[in-house]
């Protein structure tokens, strides 16, 4: 290392560190044009003072669902002062009262009383305001499945979707955001008959798309020549392994800090590898924490075996949860989609092909994450 390669104490590799923050919303949103256009079309009636179309955004973690909502909401707010948009994180606001309180705060700028007010009264206050002010409300329920877990999904959805029947002039649209459509198993026929969403799919990013997106973050987040194409491709490979673009953005940030700590002007392979070792369990545990309780129970059963046949696994799962095969089958497919398990078919079963299921991570790592979840 020459003198020119050494980073001085008052120098930094980062041109704009905010570009590498998880909540950064880029001006340009590559490889999601069709999804953004579908959202814009669904929300277009709201700009004319009408109820928008309901939507369901479906895709694995880190595929741009929440960012697409935030970008579209910004556009709507900039062009339609009569439209109020609210994004609810259902991991945090997982009860009907918490959801309605979030909407109330967005409308009135203050929180409702913590006690002494019923859900129905809070809801009436919200809807009466919408009607009297002639505003359109669009509510995005991020991680909607958490309302299912808590048993509040049907009442929240039913109240919002049928508000116009009880309160003429109320105009409310609902956007559900889930990792898999099967997450909405809890919605009953009353809700499904009025939800009827436009489904917008967010598939995993492909290798070339990941590279494009991370190159943009590098261009605006770092000074020139801080990271080589070869090192960036290593970051891309880790994103492919996890299936979560947020992993790549976080790795760029951590790798930059590692290089600065060593006083280098460039990020090396070892900086990325060290960053991944330090953060991979954080990403794994974060993902597992988002699973429903039955999914966590199923993953634990799988992790406690080197590999297990689907029939044997279902028997153990049913004894533990009393859930049926349809739910079990959907959860196995979801865990496979999320890259937590392999569930390959083999021809060695008594009746032909059967599924052999095993974890894609070290079992100990998964079990440790489940303990923290």
UniProtKB/Swiss-Prot annotation:
Annotated keywords: ATP-binding, DNA replication, Nucleotide-binding
Residues reported to bind ATP: 63-67, 205, 217
Gene3D superfamilies according to UniProt: 1.10.8.60, P-loop containing nucleotide triphosphate hydrolases, Winged helix-like DNA-binding domain superfamily/Winged helix DNA-binding domain
Source domain of life: Archaea
Keyword presence, ATP-binding: yes
Coiled-coil blocks: none
Classification via InterPro entries: AAA_16, Cdc6_C, Cdc6_lid, ORC1/CDC6, Orc1/Cdc6_arc, P-loop_NTPase, WH-like_DNA-bd_sf, WH_DNA-bd_sf
GO MF terms held by the record: ATP binding
GO biological process: DNA replication
SUPFAM superfamilies assigned: P-loop containing nucleoside triphosphate hydrolases, Winged helix' DNA-binding domain
Keyword ATP-binding: yes
Any Pfam family the entry gives: AAA_16
Function description: Involved in regulation of DNA replication.
Family: Belongs to the CDC6/cdc18 family.
Name under which the protein is recorded: ORC1-type DNA replication protein 2
Gene (name only): cdc6-2
């Amino acid at each position: 290392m020459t003198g020119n390669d050494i980073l001085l104490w008052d120098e930094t590799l980062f041109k704009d560190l905010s570009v590498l923050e998880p909540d950064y919303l880029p001006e340009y949103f590559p490889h999601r044009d069709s999804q953004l256009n579908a959202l814009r079309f669904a929300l277009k009636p709201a700009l004319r003072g009408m109820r928008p179309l309901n939507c369901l955004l479906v895709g694995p973690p880190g595929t741009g669902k929440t960012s697409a909502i935030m970008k579209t909401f910004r556009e709507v707010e900039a062009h339609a002062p009569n439209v109020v948009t609210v994004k609810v994180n259902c991991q945090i606001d997982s009860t009907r009262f918490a959801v309605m309180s979030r909407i109330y705060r967005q409308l009135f700028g203050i929180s409702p009383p913590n006690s002494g007010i019923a859900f129905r009264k809070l809801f009436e206050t919200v809807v009466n305001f919408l009607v009297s002010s002639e505003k359109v409300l669009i509510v995005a329920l991020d991680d909607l499945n958490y309302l299912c877990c808590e048993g509040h999904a049907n009442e929240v959805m039913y109240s919002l979707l049928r508000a116009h029947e009880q309160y003429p002039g109320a105009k409310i649209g609902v956007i559900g955001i889930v990792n898999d459509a099967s997450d909405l198993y809890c919605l009953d026929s009353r809700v499904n008959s009025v939800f009827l969403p436009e489904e917008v799919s967010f598939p995993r990013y492909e290798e070339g798309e990941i590279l494009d997106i991370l190159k943009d973050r590098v261009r605006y987040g770092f000074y020139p020549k801080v990271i080589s194409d070869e090192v960036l491709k290593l970051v891309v490979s880790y994103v492919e392994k996890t299936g979560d673009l947020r992993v790549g953005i976080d790795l760029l940030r951590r790798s930059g800090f590692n290089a600065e700590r060593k006083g280098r002007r460039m990020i090396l392979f070892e900086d990325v590898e060290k960053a991944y070792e330090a953060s991979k369990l954080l990403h794994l545990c974060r993902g597992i924490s988002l699973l429903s309780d039955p999914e966590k129970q199923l993953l634990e059963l799988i992790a406690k075996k080197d590999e297990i046949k689907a029939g044997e696994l279902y028997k153990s799962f049913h004894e533990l949860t009393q859930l049926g095969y349809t739910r079990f089958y959907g959860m196995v497919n979801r865990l496979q989609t999320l890259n937590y398990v392999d569930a390959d078919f083999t021809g060695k079963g008594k009746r032909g092909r059967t599924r052999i299921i095993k974890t894609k991570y070290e079992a100990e790592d998964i079990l440790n994450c489940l303990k923290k979840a």
